[in-house]
């Protein structure tokens, strides 16, 4: 546990040193944990492996592996990716690409469960929290059923492409 805390502090120092998170300047601290973290100064990347968890402004990202690139200011999360937004919605995927403020997320095979029990599934999603999000191969149902375990809702809405405007 002490090692994990050390690595967490080390990763925070690396992120702060690199200027990886503009959110730090906005007073939105990022909490970061992983079993192992390696930094490559030559290509400006960081690799976090095992029980990776990042928290910021009421949002949480967990994954098996997260790769961060300083130049692109993007993180790629792979394996058992779970993103919980500030409203409590749970979004799962095998892979997500995120900016450091969690305001732009690209995901493949997205499965979302909302606090009211409804669910949303998409083959892919380009999510922008402050503008228009686009989803391909989407499906929505207000049914509070276990869709991930194969339960089928009585009805659902399906679309080849869905656009969501936050306004």
Segments (PLM) and residue ranges:
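Bacterial N-terminal signal peptides
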Residues: 8-19
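Structural signature for solvent-exposed beta-strand/loop edge elements and short helix-capping sites
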Residues: 25-167
């Amino acid at each position: 546990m002490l090692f994990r805390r050390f690595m967490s502090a080390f990763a925070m120092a690396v992120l702060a040193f690199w200027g990886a998170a503009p959110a730090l300047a906005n007073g939105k601290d990022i909490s970061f944990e992983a079993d192992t973290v390696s930094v490559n100064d030559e290509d400006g990347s960081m690799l976090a492996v095992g029980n990776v968890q990042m928290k910021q402004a009421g949002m949480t990202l967990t994954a098996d592996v997260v790769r961060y690139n300083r130049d692109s200011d993007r993180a790629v999360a792979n394996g058992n990716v779970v993103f919980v937004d500030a409203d409590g919605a749970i979004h799962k995927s095998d892979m997500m690409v995120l900016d450091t403020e969690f305001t732009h997320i690209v995901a493949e095979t997205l499965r979302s469960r909302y606090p009211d029990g409804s669910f949303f599934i998409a083959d892919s999603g380009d999510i922008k929290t402050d503008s228009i999000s686009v989803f391909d191969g989407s499906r929505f149902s207000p049914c509070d059923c276990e869709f991930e375990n194969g339960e089928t809702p009585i009805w659902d809405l399906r679309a080849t492409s869905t656009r969501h405007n936050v306004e």
